[in-house]
Amino acid sequence: MSHARDDHQGASQGSQWLSQARTLVQEGTLFNFIRCLLLFQGDSGQKEMTPGKKIPIFVDGVVLNGPQTDVKAGEKFVEEACRLIMEEVVLKATDVNEKVCEWQPPEQLRQLLDLEMRDTGESQDKLLKLCQDVIHFSVKTNHPRFFNQLYAGLDYYSLAARIITEALNPSIYTYEVSPVFLLVEEAVLKKMIECVGWKEGDGIFNPGGSVSNMCAMNLARYRHCPDIKEKGLSGLPRLILFTSAECHYSMKKAASFLGIGTQNVYFVETDGRGKMIPEDLEKQIWQARQEGAVPFLVCATSGTTVLGAFDPLDEIAEVCERHGLWLHVDASWGGSALVSRKHRRLLHGIHRADSVAWNPHKMLMAGIQCSALLVKDKSDLLKKCYSAKATYLFQQDKFYDVSYDTGDKSIQCSRRPDAFKFWMTWKALGTSGLEERVNRAFALSRYLVDEIKKREGFKLLMEPEYTNVCFWYIPPSLREMEEGPEFWRKLSLVAPAIKEKMMKKGSLMLGYQPHRGKVNFFRQVVISPQVSREDMDFLLDEIDSLGRDM
């Protein structure tokens, strides 16, 4: 009986297969029909399927048997791509003989790169060539002479962590899908909170300091008027926030995005070093109240973008406490000084803040992006402000402690495990190693300042407080000229012209900007431990070489 049943089942399956095959031929899908034949692996006289083989299943003309991806080819491609990364990125990261960039204008770069997406895929050899081109024409931010931004250098431990997370492709909103990375984030946040000086607190990692600042602004507003979450802006009084005239531009963006309005961002005057003046802050708070507006937030800055200035947090906290205002500290750039016993004094009083933004991807080289928003509150204010209680993610009847499902503390759903990069570096170096990294950056900046003072044609903007060294290069043609309007007009042209030359040569990258009435000057920032005294000397020598004939 069993043999008869098997024969009947085989005949039925064969009949089903023939019916599907006829349909494919009638529809003209010859390719799928051939695949069907190959998968069936039988002949017209075969009554039973080959042991271990399954007849092909079709849905809408698509064969569903087996994986579509060529696994072996994929593994080979990843292996070759990783070899390319090691040879062209990692091994060359500290080689000063390599160019920082291979500058090409957009029109020419488009011609050099094959950017078009086609109907058919490219060969693996072509893809590897594209990878090589991408590396070749990209700016080498790992290079010891890349000084253009507030990030630089290569941290090998962070890089390894990034490779792991890219391969695992996790998203951290619930413990069930990302158990390790949620516990890692919890551990890192706890340690960062200790660095700030709080006994306890809360926090979340965000995609950059701008988002952390915006989330802090929204959190402060929610604390002030919690009904806004459900009722929106209607019926709210005119809300005012105060920040330094030297603040990061993300403050204006956040006010615009949140519906507060950029006109309701009051910019507090700064002193000659770029620090917020607490007396002007208090004056503006009273002025806002006289206008019938409602102050709710003060945003101080620890480490301004251009000058590297640190606002006087203790004095600002006194003002905030008198007026009942939330104090947020944007320490995206300067927060890393907290790990240095010698330099953490720059952030004295930060423990009095209600929230802090801190980017380990800057001086601590955790890799972009790695930004934490730290909050002193422990009443679940983050979750109350941002939760949407999506029932498909945050079920309350799970078999584990759902307090580990932290996704409702964030404005995001999918969220990268950015804390893991910083955790790996911290585990590798220890707090003392991070401290040494910060102290070395300060020492190299001090060396550069001393060299600038010694050299003819270089002029400091001011003595730096952090590792931002701002200076002018004055070419020989201007050195005997009186410092009047014409002198400053001509000097304003020098930094952009030298920047163009260094970019086209590929020798180094250095930022410049005008700032609050001062004409274009260079801003040199030391971050990477791969940077040496010789690189500081080269920086000044190269600027002099490129600008001497101007």
UniProtKB/Swiss-Prot annotation:
Expressed in skeletal muscles and kidney (at protein level). Expressed in skeletal muscle and weakly in brain. Not expressed in liver or kidney. Expressed in brain, olfactory bulb, liver, muscle and kidney with the highest expression in olfactory bulb and almost not detected in liver (at protein level). Catalyzes the decarboxylation of L-aspartate, 3-sulfino-L-alanine (cysteine sulfinic acid), and L-cysteate to beta-alanine, hypotaurine and taurine, respectively. The preferred substrate is L-aspartate. Does not exhibit any decarboxylation activity toward glutamate. Activated weakly by 0.2-0.4 mM Li(+). Inhibited by bis-carboxymethyl-trithiocarbonate, ethylxanthogenacetic acid and 2,5-disulfoaniline. Keywords: Decarboxylase, Lyase, Pyridoxal phosphate. Belongs to the group II decarboxylase family. Its EC number is 4.1.1.11, 4.1.1.29. It is an enzyme of class 4 (lyase). It comes from Mus musculus (Mouse). The modification N6-(pyridoxal phosphate)lysine is found at residue 362. GO terms for molecular function: aspartate 1-decarboxylase activity; pyridoxal phosphate binding; sulfinoalanine decarboxylase activity. Its cofactor is pyridoxal 5'-phosphate. The keyword Lyase applies. This is Acidic amino acid decarboxylase GADL1. InterPro entries: PyrdxlP-dep_de-COase, PyrdxlP-dep_Trfase, PyrdxlP-dep_Trfase_major, Pyridoxal-P_BS.
